[in-house]
Structure formats: C-alpha cells, structure tokens
C-alpha cells in the first residue's frame, strides 16, 4: 500500500458542550477526510458551519456523519425504527450539511453513518438496501464509507455505489471481522495504535480480541476524535505511515 485515507469524526459537540478532548482544530490538518456530525447524535448548525470552514482551510475532504436521533446517548444507543424512517432521517442530515458545504463552494465527498446506526446498517439488509437505493437515486457517485463484509458493503457492491472500506485504528476486531462495539473507549497507547495501522497497511493483517491474525482489506483508516488522547493517536499514526513511505490522501 502506497497511500491511504485517514479519516476522523469532527464537529461532535453541541452548543457549549464538547465531546472528547476538544481537539478538532489540531486534528483537522492531520487527516485527509472529515466525517462531520449533522445534528442528530451531535453537532448543530453553527458547529457544522465552523467544521466545514475548518476543513476547507486545510484542504480536507468532507462527508456527512448522520446518526440516530439520540443526543443524550451520543448516537450509541440502538433505536428501533422502520427502514424508511431511518433513511429519511439520514437524508435530512445529509441535506443540511450539503448546504453548508455549498456555502464554501464545496461538494460532499462521502457519507458515513455514525455509531449504532453504522452498526445497524451493517447488519440490517432491508435498511441498508433502502439507504443505498436512495443514494443511487440522489447521488450515485457519493462515496459510502462502510465496514468490509457488512450488509452495507455487499449491497453497495451489488448496486454499484462507490465504497470506501474502513479500518478502525482505535477499535478491536473479533474473528468474524466485526469491530467490537463499546460505549466507553479506554485510552490507548499511540505507538501501539500506529504499529497496528502500519502492520495492517503493509501486511493486511490485524490481531483480534481472540489473539488470532485476521486478514483485512481497506481504503481508509479511522481514528475517532472522541477517543481519549485522539490527537496523539492521529499524530503518531500519520507520522508512522509517512515515515514508512505511505502517503495520506483522500479517496478523491
């Protein structure tokens, strides 16, 4: 691998509240793609505008990061709802961010569902299909960030939606290739995370929670900005990759 996307979730505060270490401004110049919170799990109109402006300043590609309607739970609680309701909620959020992007003369590069909604679409064939079918009608060239092997990935391939496969630097994997979902993420060692990412890029392997090596293929590395010590994780990972001759570059 000679180049890889490095993405992070941005703008995940709300009004006067900040999620994580409040280091968006320091992380933004280090990443190539930003997933911007669109108001349902986090974010508000003012934070969306500020985050788009910050991404534009640093030449970072932007994407919508729609979540469940769950500000209290930060979008990490599953909400049982019909597929059409979930897709309508995602379209609403996508449209909101698109206008702030247009204000800066930008287009959205991608969409990446957040948290529990991301995992719901990864498992629910009906919701994933309706979402991808809707994207095909609305914006068939919009990149869809997803987990390899998920329902989103399978249906996206089937219908021809362009996909970006993700590798999670700050999450554990199990032997099935799924990320181990958690509501509380512990602090991680930046050098260990950088080593994990470099090995995945060079060898296409990651160590699972069962202690086994798992083959992994991906186009983008995700480090969540709300993970404790996120700035150090992003900085160490970028430095390690660039030191190994791997360029950090957005998919488009």
From Swiss-Prot:
Subunit structure: Forms a complex composed of PxpA, PxpB and PxpC.
Protein origin, superkingdom: Bacteria
Protein name: 5-oxoprolinase subunit A 1
Keyword Zinc: no
EC number: 3.5.2.9
InterPro entries, alphabetized: Glyco_hydro/deAcase_b/a-brl, LamB/YcsF/PxpA-like
Family of this protein: Belongs to the LamB/PxpA family.
This protein's UniProt keywords: ATP-binding, Hydrolase, Nucleotide-binding
GO biological process, one term: carbohydrate metabolic process
Described purpose of this protein according to its UniProt entry: Catalyzes the cleavage of 5-oxoproline to form L-glutamate coupled to the hydrolysis of ATP to ADP and inorganic phosphate.
Keyword Thylakoid part of the UniProt annotation: no
Catalytic activity reported: 5-oxo-L-proline + ATP + 2 H2O = L-glutamate + ADP + phosphate + H(+)
GO MF entries: 5-oxoprolinase (ATP-hydrolyzing) activity; ATP binding
């Amino acid at each position: 691998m000679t180049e890889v996307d490095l993405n992070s979730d941005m703008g995940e505060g709300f009004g006067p509240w900040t999620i994580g270490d409040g280091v968006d401004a320091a992380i933004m110049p280090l990443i190539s793609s930003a997933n911007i919170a669109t108001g349902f799990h986090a974010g508000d109109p003012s934070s969306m505008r500020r985050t788009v402006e910050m991404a534009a300043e640093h030449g970072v590609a932007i994407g919508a990061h729609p979540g469940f309607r769950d500000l209290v739970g930060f979008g990490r609680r599953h909400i049982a709802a019909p597929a059409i309701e979930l897709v309508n909620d995602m379209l609403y959020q996508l449209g909101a961010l698109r206008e702030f992007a247009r204000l800066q003369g930008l287009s959205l590069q991608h969409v990446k569902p957040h948290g529990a909604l991301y995992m719901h679409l990864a498992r629910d064939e009906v919701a994933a299909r309706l979402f991808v079918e809707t994207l095909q009608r609305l914006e068939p060239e919009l990149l869809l960030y997803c987990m390899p092997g998920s329902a989103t990935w399978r249906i996206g391939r089937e219908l021809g939606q362009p996909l970006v496969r993700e590798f999670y630097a700050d999450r554990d994997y199990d032997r099935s290739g799924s990320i181990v979902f958690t509501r509380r993420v512990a602090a991680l060692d930046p050098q260990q995370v950088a080593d994990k990412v470099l090995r995945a890029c060079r060898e296409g392997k990651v160590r699972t929670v069962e202690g086994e090596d798992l083959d992994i293929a991906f186009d983008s590395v995700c480090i969540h900005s709300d993970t404790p010590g996120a700035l150090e994780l992003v900085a160490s990972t970028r430095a390690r990759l660039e030191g190994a001759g791997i360029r950090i570059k957005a998919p488009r």
